[in-house]
Amino acid sequence: MKKFTFPITTIFLSVLILVSCKETKNNSVQPSDKTSVLKAGYQIEPVNIQNVKLNDSFWLPIIKRVQEVTIAYAIQKCNEEGRFENFLIAGKQKTGTVRGEMPFDDTDVYKIIEGASNTLISAPNPKLERVLDSLIAIVKIGQEADGYLTTWRTINPAKPPATWVPVIEGKRWESLQISHECYNAGHLIEAAVVHYEATGKRNFLDIAIKNADLFVKTFGDGPGQVKGVPGHQIIETGLIKLYQITGKEDYLKLAKYFLDNRGNPNNHKLYGEYAQDHIPVIQQNEVVGHAVRAVYMYAGMTDIAAMTKDKSYENAVNNLWNNMVNKKMYITGGIGSRHDGEAFGTNYELPNLTAYNETCAAIGDVYWNHRLHSLYGKSQYFDVIERTMYNGLISGISLTGKEFFYPNALEADGVYKSNRGSCTRQAWFDCSCCPTNLIRFIPSIPGLIYSKTNDVLYVNLYASSNSAFKLGKTDLQISQQTSYPWNGKVGISVNPKKEGQFTIKLRVPGWARNEVLPGDLYTYKKASTQRATITINGEAVAVQQQDGYFTINRNWKKGDKIALNFPMEVQEVQTNSKVETNKNKVSLEYGPIVYAVEEIDNKTNFDKINVASGDSFKVKKEVNLLNGVNVIENEKFKAIPYYSWSNRGVGKMKVWLDYKN
């Protein structure tokens, strides 16, 4: 057999091409109105990122950095560490042993393709599309004839890349708890669906369908089928997305089978709390175990609640969400407090120095809350999303796009190595799930801004942008002008093609309603007396908030202008007294941004920094600091946005400050 050498050469060329791939300059909105894949089964659907063009000064530079720097960097790292080579060895186009240290290394390739595909939706780029075609060609080589695709097992089932993966007889599916065969398939499917939406090409989708069809044939209670559930969840949401674009109910049924049989000892030997496999999912009411697995599972459960109208699933996800937000979420939106097991702790167990808060968990939580919003339309889910995105999620990536946090601690002493062996950001990890998950997620952010029904538009997030889509039968163009999150003033231009009546719901952020997060885990020490206001065409409007939204139903016409003002002031946040680590401490916020003090700005007095009753603060824009940020300062200290810490070397940091009456 002739050895396949072209793709590896292509990888090196791909990196060079990508470095030169600047975003296609395109501020106009595509005329098509592509429906989001999340739509089917939900009453509310997100407006697809193809219909939303950002021009803001906060998110757009971050997305561009991922497009122009991080994707190329990750391809280079994956090439160096043998991610691509594994597919070629599995397909017998190269000889060798498995490269890498994790049984899920294949997923780094899939997540890069997914994130890059999302950039193609926002801004078509033929060069980047050719790079993806090369990567997909390599993936295809590693797929077995019947659709199976986990390269380490194909290369040598007797020698997994990690010693903690058990080998019994070397058969497929024999160690589902830890083999990550299902997890690999889940990321493959999710990435393939996004790539298909972005390009209309089936080259990646056909690989995923072939793989999914093998799962449908293999798993179940029928004669000769394998019983069991994934060790690491995500295949459930992948299968449901595949069902949504193909209409093939077998995928939905298998996703539900996996969820229905979690916690079922008659189906398999249970994996325990770590994998949320201790009791049936519909009986679970406390978030436990590995945080990333958990939120991926809860997202799948929410899909099932929406698709099947199963009230037992709906009740379970509501109970789980309430437990997480009320008792186990950090002020930054981070979740999963324990390094041991990368897991949720007990209720109110929220340490700062040793906080884990895996970046992947923050990303998974956004995916889950987005689904909950599509199910219920309540702003509380976007309060969680906004807090997470601006704080404990983008803290995971540096301002250069080439260094990362895997955990996201809320305190650093300059000694404790919280970041997988380092006190500061790292250039890569042996387990590189977080960097590639950031690539996967960040380009999808424009798809979070709006949601809609036939006659209701939800404005969920605020960012300068131009958008065009159909609202029912109405062709609608809408634009935002704002300096959010540094300023709370937002201008919105509404331009329907024809005058008509419909409803616009404008989210009033929780912080602008004196609510840190839903529930009583955090409160502002002193409630703001300032109130959010709204005008339409220059006239003040008295409108009651409904589920956290200003709701305006009227006859809208071209040129209508909405002006929102969410007054910002420095707020001191206190924690529920049941959180022992934060007693007699406060954190500082300005708008949606959580602040931290860093030693580099406070060298002479860092260990003595405190907030006293009656302290005043000023907010100042520093355009040359950390890519341009608002800082909070007074005569005692200077604070920077938490997400931007550790971009200037190793040092101390803290979010929670001693409070003195």
Predicted features and spans:
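Bacterial N-terminal signal peptides that target proteins for export
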Residues: M1-T9
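C-terminal motif of bacterial Sec signal peptides marking the signal peptidase cleavage site
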Residues: I17-S20
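Bacterial lipoprotein signal-peptidase II cleavage site
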Residues: K22-S28
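Aromatic (Trp/Tyr) and acidic
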Residues: S28-P126, R130, P161-A198, Q233-D250, ...
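Carboxylate/His-rich catalytic cores and anion/metal-binding grooves
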Residues: K127-R153, L252-D260, S312-K328
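Asp-box/WD-like beta-propeller blade repeats and closely related beta-sheet repeat scaffolds
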Residues: I155-C182, I189, L205, I209-P230
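C-terminal beta-rich recognition modules with glycine/proline-rich loops and embedded aromatic residues
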Residues: V317, D383-N391, G396-N495, R513-I536, ...
